[in-house]
Amino acid sequence: MIRLVFALRRKPGSSREEFQDYWLNKHAPIVASVSSDLDILRYVQTHTLTDPANAAAQNARGSMEPEYDGVAELWWASEAALTANLQNEAAQKAGAVLLEDEAKFIDLPNSPLWFAYEYPQINPSPEDVFAKVKSNIVRVFFPLRHQGQISE
């Protein structure tokens, strides 16, 4: 499987709470409505907590990227399936619908995205465990910056 990872920052002038509410309650249903046109197999939103633990984790690691307000992840069956799907007109229209809505609440120039393969290192069982507000499941993201002394 291949996935899109989209590290999101809210548009200036909106609070994190407003951003996350819109993303979950307005944008997510739009993604769901076009998911079959885009052949999306899975869509996950990870909402950043406003918690002192975030600052502590960042301070322990030195200079880090400014905090993101959340991370969106979308999965497709394969790179070939994704590439083929993006050639069809319905997928192109669906992508335009998503981009139009994203421009309403996401600071797009400051919200990087990339396609990636995942390599699970620890995989909980059962796999149908979902994080919910006030659950004991918390996900941690460490966007890594390439160090100049390490070759690509």
Sequence positions of predicted segments:
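Macromolecular interaction modules
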Residues: M1-E152
